[in-house]
């Protein structure tokens, strides 16, 4: 099975995202709970949330791999395997019912911890992975990882998925993530020492770019030129999601979802208005922090994804909001990410394609 073989042979889609790309908005618009031909989980994905949290709470994410203790290695192996098993279980449920399986995942959450360690340590060499996902028998013997596959999944496993990508302008996504991190720190869900490495890890599109290139290189030859109007793998830009309904409708058709269920308006649950859901007295849950805008809106907020973004003008706002030091660093992250964003945006599913 290959990742971009058409509908009948690939019935599971993984939407590859990074923080603050409006992925929660996209999932709400897709109305997965009303898609009679699809199965997901209650979050529309995030199967590797527990692995992400474990990496933080054990400090494994911020510790060079060669300095991991045996306990850290064992814990991370177990949690990645556990999350993978849940992903496969839900996928198998969808397959048993003849339905499409849809999941979204931040690319950093299923990236090899060794690749993350090398990146945060600014190492050019490739450290061997401490994580070895055990695949079910139907997938056969692992056949290795190609150079630009920095995920925890071997090549032949990734080929059983239709990978699609969601991107958002770095000047919108990165400062939004920083605001969220500061709010999580305020709510005692993030520690001060985490903010810098988490920003460095997430204020880049390199992970999405590498995986996109892997997908393109490994898709079946007939698909590379079978439709001149549509480029594979599919890429969505958050700006198009908010402003061009035809693009999202086309995306639905291409991955096996029914566009009739798409939503641009919804009701706001009373208990989430203003302050969000609290998981313990006086503190919002992490989910409430990350979804605050979405949970307190009744429709798509188009002004959150403007068509034109002036980085220089945004920089002035960052200086006022974050201080000059962070404003300067934010601009550096954004400008360094722009080549990858521009590259991926040029590949996006467009209005004229729809």
Residue ranges and their predicted role:
Residues 2-12, 258-354:
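PAPS-dependent sulfotransferases, especially Golgi type II membrane carbohydrate sulfotransferases
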Residues 68-83, 145, 200-207, 322-329, ...:
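Soluble or luminal CAZymes and related metallo-dependent hydrolases
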Residues 1-92, 99, 105:
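PAPS-dependent sulfotransferase catalytic core
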Residues 71-97, 110, 116-127, 150-154:
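Phosphate-binding/switch loop-helix module in NTP-utilizing enzymes
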Residues 106-262:
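PAPS-dependent sulfotransferase catalytic domain
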Residues 97-101, 162:
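Loop/turn-to-beta-strand initiation segments
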Residues 22-34, 235-261, 277-297:
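PAPS/PAP-binding and catalytic site of the sulfotransferase fold
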Residues 25, 29, 207-215, 250, ...:
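Amphipathic alpha-helical segments that form well-ordered structural scaffolds
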